[in-house]
Amino acid sequence: MVNTHVNLPGLDLKNPVMPASGTFGFGDVPAAQKFDLNDLGAMVIKTTTPHATTGNPQPQIAILEDGVLNSVGLTNPGVDQVISEKLTKLRHQYLDLPIMASVGGDSEDDYVEVAKKLSASGLVNALEINVSCPNVAQGGMSFGVHAGVVEELTKKIKMAVALPIYVKLTPNVTDIVEIAKAAESGGADGISMINTVLGMRIDVKTRKPLLGHNMGGLSGEAVKPIAIRMISQVRQVTQLPIIGMGGISTAQDVIEFILAGANAVAVGSAHFEDELAAKHIAENLPAELEKLGIEDINDLVGQVKFN
């Protein structure tokens, strides 16, 4: 019997597969209603902000040959309503499923406020800190591009909450290793990586970008080599748990990410092709491990053999 159980801070996972934040909303999107979320290791909810956010102009999503470009924005009803309605309902439906909430904001105070409220709710097991949000006080640059800002933000949230926190790294930086080290110095319990890669596509007939917001985040197959490279680099400098993401669509991809250094994975864009992608990947994983003669998935973490 192959062991796929993974134990991370705050997250006791029956298998290492979860949906990426935003994929299944707050567990209320049609795809999430079509199967038992207990088939997954955990549920990750959409990024939550202090107040309701409407998102970016349409079109928000462009499906490409080898990925997805999106500028949905952080559409959510605000943290109070997320707790009183969305999370309460989700937790009532799934009493034992590990739930990770994603935290966003325009300022450090926003992050701390949302994190404190989510932590105090008693409805979630861990927090993912989405540092790809624009830092309004610093001219709109993403929080996640400055090591000093990431360290300080992580420290402030860590001091304010009892829950484990996972800092979600943006790949749109010169040196992701420096940012990962900063998150660890700030007290992060784990790292999620990678968020989407900033991109743009243009319709040659209209000469307009495909997205209403012009630029957006690229995810899916196209970013997989970037994600694997960055996870491998970060694994060389930290023992923190890593939740890997970026183009995972098969059980074999999961194994590749774990060899690079991830402990668990999140699946996002694959759901555009198969709305039950995460479920199918989790189901297929034991057989793939068996083929490779692996008895315990945890034995594979970071075991890439460099040339």
Swiss-Prot record:
Active site, UniProt feature? 133
Annotated cofactor note:
Binds 1 FMN per subunit.
Q: In which pathway does it act?
A: Pyrimidine metabolism; UMP biosynthesis via de novo pathway
List cellular component terms (GO): cytoplasm
Give the source lineage, highest ranks first. Bacteria, Bacillati, Bacillota, Bacilli, Lactobacillales
InterPro entries the UniProt entry points to: Aldolase_TIM, DHO_dehydrogenase, DHOD_1B, Dihydroorotate_DH_1, Dihydroorotate_DH_1_2, Dihydroorotate_DH_cat, Dihydroorotate_DH_CS, Dihydroorotate_DH_I
Name of this protein = Dihydroorotate dehydrogenase A (fumarate)
Give an example GO molecular function. dihydroorotate dehydrogenase (fumarate) activity
Q: Name one Pfam family in it.
A: DHO_dh
Q: What job does the chain carry out?
A: Catalyzes the conversion of dihydroorotate to orotate with fumarate as the electron acceptor.
What are its GO biological-process terms? 'de novo' pyrimidine nucleobase biosynthetic process; 'de novo' UMP biosynthetic process
Q: Where does substrate bind?
A: 46, 70-74, 130, 195-196
Q: In which domain of life is the source organism classified?
A: Bacteria
Q: Which gene encodes it?
A: pyrD
Q: Which UniProt keywords apply?
A: Cytoplasm, Flavoprotein, FMN, Oxidoreductase, Pyrimidine biosynthesis
Where, by residue number, does FMN bind?
21, 46-47, 130, 168, 194, 220, 246-247, 268-269
